[in-house]
Amino acid sequence: MHIGIIPDGNRRWAEQHKLSREAGYAYGLKPGLLLLQQAKTYGIQEITYYGFTVDNCRRPKEQVQAFQQACVQAVHDLATEGVDLLVIGNTDSKCFPEELKKYTNRTAINGGGIRLNFLVNYGWKWDLSNIKSAGFLHSSDISRIDMVIRWGGMRRLSGFLPVQSVYADFYVEEKLWPDYEKSDFYRAMDWYKKQD
C-alpha cells in the first residue's frame, strides 16, 4: 500500500499559538517522523510526503527559508529510520535546497526499507513537462497512490502527484498537522478499509 501525506496547517497552527508563521514549520517535524514509524509498523510499503510546491516559493522570503530548512531537517530525521529515500522536485530552481540534491536518485539508507518519497519544490506542470522532452514523468519512480491523507481540513490535492493519485481515496483530517496524534493514522486506515 502507498499513502500520500499532505501535512497542511503549520502556519495556521503557529498563528493560533501566537507564534510567527515561519515558526510553525518546525513544529511539523515530529509528526512526520511519528507517522513514518507508524506506517512502517502497520506494513505500508510506500509513503510520500508533500514538502512544498513551486508555487510556495512565491511566498515571503522568511517563509520560504523556514519551509526549506524544515524540509531539509525532515528528510534527515526521516532518513534515520531505514528507508529507500527519493526526493523529487525541480532541482534547476534556486528554491530547491542544495543539501537534498544527493537524494534525487533513490537511495537506501540504514539498510533501506519502506519507500519514502519527499516532494520538495514540486510542481505538477514541471513533472508532466518531462513527458514531452524525455518520454516519462520526473516522478516515474513513484508508484500509484492508494490513499491521500490531508491534514488541516482543506479538500484539495494542491497539485499532489496528479498521475499517481488519480484513483486514490482522499481522506481529510480536520486537525492541523502539528497537532498530529497516533490515532489520526489509525482513524484514516480504518476509513480506508471501508472504501470500495
Named regions from a protein language model:
Residues 1-196:
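Flexible, compositionally biased loop and terminal segments
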